[in-house]
Amino acid sequence: MPAALVENSQVICEVWASNLEEEMRKIREIVLSYSYIAMDTEFPGVVVRPIGEFRSSIDYQYQLLRCNVDLLKIIQLGLTFTNEKGEYPSGINTWQFNFKFNLTEDMYSQDSIDLLANSGLQFQKHEEEGIDTLHFAELLMTSGVVLCDNVKWLSFHSGYDFGYMVKLLTDSRLPEEEHEFFHILNLFFPSIYDVKYLMKSCKNLKGGLQEVADQLDLQRIGRQHQAGSDSLLTGMAFFRMKELFFEDSIDDAKYCGRLYGLGTGVAQKQNEDVDCAQEKMSILAMINNMQQ
């Protein structure tokens, strides 16, 4: 049984504007030895539907994602760190980042906000003490968490999660075409394993994250629909599934870089791979200049 299933030493750290830089310094050290990162976001729902003609249902799903991510703001991000065996660092292993969000000024789905409020999110505190996304993006760029081939990202049905991450890191709207989105995604997050996509090869596993956790006999730490708790549970599910269904070895060619409900993701042209490498070098040079 992977150590990721041992609950007694797991700790979720709440991060607000006041302790952001201190916690990011810790993460820069942690990721050197614990480079498997389970991720989840909380966002204010779906508020618009795209109109027009679409090439396929997958194209429609991407356009639905794109128009909502462009309009809305991320509320929470959860990151849980383990090593390749599913073992946690001592002490804190999960960070829950709470971003600025204003119920008076920002757009949202009322049902989603009600769900998050009932799950314990403190929207008044988000408004007053939340993290500025631009400042967070600057710190994330230099954290060793993104743009690194050795870092493995674990997620669950994560098109929207990574949509918000790409928006946050680029400070711009998502690309109009899905293949352009995956090009940028693979630049920042070279290795992604979406647990919901992995479930396609896991007999009898079905449902959302909590249902899957129940089927795998996993115990949640923290509250459902909070990003830290959900990221922690996502990591647990990945390592349990890896052990039970994949004999502790997942075929990257089949699963890496694919997001459930969207296109193939990794089906990039070779010349795009060259462009991606050149873009990464440019970004790394920019980061190096920022650190000097």
Swiss-Prot record:
Keyword annotations for this protein? Cytoplasm, Exonuclease, Hydrolase, Metal-binding, Nuclease, Nucleus, Repressor, RNA-binding, RNA-mediated gene silencing, Transcription, Transcription regulation, Translation regulation
Disulfide links within the chain: none
| E.C. number(s) listed in UniProt | 3.1.13.4
Answer whether the UniProt record assigns the keyword Plastid to this protein. Answer: no
Keyword RNA-binding appears in the UniProt entry: yes
Could you say which protein family the record assigns here?
Belongs to the CAF1 family.
Assembly and partners? Component of the CCR4-NOT complex; distinct complexes seem to exist that differ in the participation of probably mutually exclusive catalytic subunits; the complex contains two deadenylase subunits, CNOT6 or CNOT6L, and CNOT7 or CNOT8. In the complex interacts directly with CNOT1. Interacts with BTG1, BTG2 and TOB1. Interacts with BTG4.
Q: What is this protein called?
A: CCR4-NOT transcription complex subunit 8
What organism is this sequence from? Mus musculus
The gene from which this protein is expressed is: Cnot8
